């Protein structure tokens, strides 16, 4: 068992790390004291009379040092600066008696001198009442709700993510959450095979490099590099440079390298293999996702999940591999007039993609959540379909969102990038593109005013002080829909479509509790394939459409995002975590957003989007009830839920009538929720003219010759299903066109 545990520890970056130095949150002692009391209110200790089996959890509290400092550190590092400022002010005011009176009202009054108590002196029941009241505030009192959300989320998120040096957390053990050997035990590969690094021959990890070693490492990989001490840069020459290694970048790099071009891939994240993945929720999120998986829209309404490691989103996606729907292709080819979407070329590209990433159509064994979805649909007479996956039919990994520890999921790091390095491509990790290098275009055969001649980049998190200038004949941006537009805008491009038309596939979640005793469903919510089933809801009467599927949601995320009404209620939710099946409703959005700068995303849903989500939520709840849930609910801030035992049809419909797609944390209403997006598209779309898109039909910038885009930002609108196959197929077509355009030109 100890051998298994050692093998499951994973890469040091994917494990909980002991803090080796002081804190940088900047909170004063009085602010920390106020925050500590708020943390303890969210997760208070209880009496030791609780049943012994979960005693270690029920008596657990969030007051032990250095808990509050860690929470403060996470808030400052990941929270939006405006929200953090609000929190600091409120924490300071709460440290005074009359400040507490101002913010908390009569609940802080006492019969004894000095008659007004500080927040830290209030009994638990009054503190809970104050926090519940803050959660309901809006308008000019919105800062209270923001404080509530920030403190609640990070308190619970950290509590259920911290582990000791043995990767243990008593709270996780108490709720029955155990991942030791979950996927690897079923994997027949030897330890030597697990440790194999498929990209080894072509990868340079700059976190292991310095200014002394980097030139030699590049030269050994066949890359032309010169050290320019005058400009304090490394000048690199290649045929093609690709920024990003996800769905688009991986495919583009492979096609360009196979054509004999010297390709350099820049990836700001790190490289991990199956042996490296720990399966630990928060350490994995912090390393594998953009902004640690904690990126939100400016108003806090959406949480945005986007991959940020070698393989990009394909390293952390949930395996769904769905071809572009025919009606979407028709819309794009006829409505948007992008003809290749309606061509045989695109169909052939989808064929090539599905073959290369090993898409299978069947699932041998469904996990707990998918069993619930299938049974509920069956009992309601609803059609449920199997979801194609880029993994074997017997793949039973419920933690692929933290990297596939079985090594069975065929992301670009296992497929297209392997093809690329086998054909001489080099991947530089820990390198962030800062801007494209644009010069005046003197070509008489091209109307574009600028010409892209490469990328200006820098090392992140390593010991390399000099910048990089990569000179290339072709530059491909595959940084994703959240990062390609800011990169293009920071380079001086001005097309009005850059950064606009962002689509998110908005998601809202429901849950249903299924006690293990006498249940027809086996397993835990985190076991088995994440998405193996789907129900396409299409209400002909209302015209509402949504898809229902199951998510991965780890205990820390579940605790942080679940509605909070009291400490005991939260602990009860967590005890039920393993047998709480989640269903989400996803819609093909008509609304859109903007991303002009990194981490600055705005988005607006339309009335129709909200109607679709509302219908999807109600359908998901019906499915859970039909499957036999004893209790169901939503993520609405007040803890909206319903007991299902002996429920009448009338009572259920009355409950469902109250279910709605309420606004986000910044909404004016009393109730709010958190929306999610794991698919970002359209923020640098193609168009037949510069007025209709930022790129032409070949994926080339209307403003800069030689600058192409191969990622989800290029898509004309939302796909309506997981966009991985669509992005890879589009990148396949575009990169093939790039090769054709260069075939008669001399390589570098």
Curated annotation (Swiss-Prot):
It catalyses: a long-chain primary fatty alcohol + O2 = a long-chain fatty aldehyde + H2O2. GO terms for cellular component: endoplasmic reticulum; membrane. Its main location: membrane. Keywords: FAD, Flavoprotein, Membrane, Oxidoreductase, Transmembrane, Transmembrane helix. The active site is at residue 679. It is a multi-pass membrane protein. This is Long-chain-alcohol oxidase FAO4B. It comes from Arabidopsis thaliana. The lineage of its organism: Eukaryota, Viridiplantae, Streptophyta, Embryophyta, Tracheophyta.
